[in-house]
Curated annotation (Swiss-Prot):
<dbReference type="InterPro" id="IPR035937">
    <property type="entry name" value="MutM-like_N-ter"/>
</dbReference>
<dbReference type="InterPro" id="IPR012319">
    <property type="entry name" value="FPG_cat"/>
</dbReference>
<protein>
    <recommendedName>
        <fullName>Formamidopyrimidine-DNA glycosylase</fullName>
        <ecNumber>3.2.2.23</ecNumber>
        <ecNumber>4.2.99.18</ecNumber>
    </recommendedName>
</protein>
<feature type="active site" description="Schiff-base intermediate with DNA">
    <location>
        <position position="2"/>
    </location>
</feature>
<dbReference type="GO" id="GO:0034039">
    <property type="term" value="F:8-oxo-7,8-dihydroguanine DNA N-glycosylase activity"/>
</dbReference>
<keyword id="KW-0234">DNA repair</keyword>
<dbReference type="InterPro" id="IPR015887">
    <property type="entry name" value="DNA_glyclase_Znf_dom_DNA_BS"/>
</dbReference>
<feature type="binding site">
    <location>
        <position position="151"/>
    </location>
    <ligand>
        <name>DNA</name>
    </ligand>
</feature>
<comment type="subunit">
    <text>Monomer.</text>
</comment>
<keyword id="KW-0326">Glycosidase</keyword>
<keyword id="KW-0862">Zinc</keyword>
<feature type="binding site">
    <location>
        <position position="90"/>
    </location>
    <ligand>
        <name>DNA</name>
    </ligand>
</feature>
<dbReference type="InterPro" id="IPR015886">
    <property type="entry name" value="DNA_glyclase/AP_lyase_DNA-bd"/>
</dbReference>
<keyword id="KW-0227">DNA damage</keyword>
<feature type="active site" description="Proton donor; for beta-elimination activity">
    <location>
        <position position="57"/>
    </location>
</feature>
<keyword id="KW-0378">Hydrolase</keyword>
<dbReference type="InterPro" id="IPR000214">
    <property type="entry name" value="Znf_DNA_glyclase/AP_lyase"/>
</dbReference>
Amino acid sequence: MPELPEVEVTKQGVSPYLIDNRVTDLIIRNPSLRWPVPDIAKQIIGQTIRAVRRRAKYLLIDTDAGTTIVHLGMSGSLRILPINSPVEKHDHIDLVLASGKILRYNDPRRFGAWLWNELPEQAHPLLAKLGPEPLESAFNSSYLLSALANKKKAIKLCLMDNHIVVGVGNIYANEALFAAGIHPQAEAGKVDAERISILVAEVKQILARAIKQGGTTLKDFTNAEGKPGYFAQKLHVYGRGGDTCTHCGQLLSEIRLGQRATVFCSICQQR
């Protein structure tokens, strides 16, 4: 599943082609995504794209008339292509631009979203209750320590809770907890301030590094040019259950936590 770095890489890739460009058509070949794709051709055709933003794992394409909200789901991708590019399987939506380019949405599993919003952002149900961005200053050790106070849930589940902090999905939660030396099942409210400070720093560093290296390639992710990311080569624990720890040589343990694969080192990550 594309996580925050993959969506940020996508945003950086498509933005130069979209901003200040005029929409000339919207082609919806298959409206059956996670939610039905609304027929917004009348609203968006003729509009100039003013900004492209990311909020959590949502890509927001702003015009004066409203905002297109895109979520890549489990397997979605956005690519910039010439207007006459052949349509391939799972190419569900084209946003056609006056420049002669198209923004094409491809999604084999169709669990992503392409929605339209004319409300204030804080009033939209998908965006209203999101926590701070992990790469911004609002996400700091003081904030996280306060947010986790008295919480009995496992620290990994809290780290993946979008009400606490957005965009830290399974891959990067595994990696950040390993880097901080925190057991994923540790009770969140009992993790001390020093460890929380280290965890915040590791979340920021790991996400920033993944963005710089182009996102993580596991199965489906490609960037806006159709190229894979390369951060998978740098993963220490995610997807490596049963392999040896890169720090101590101990075999890595794998469990299910919140129905997600969780890999950790029982030596390096103490409760």
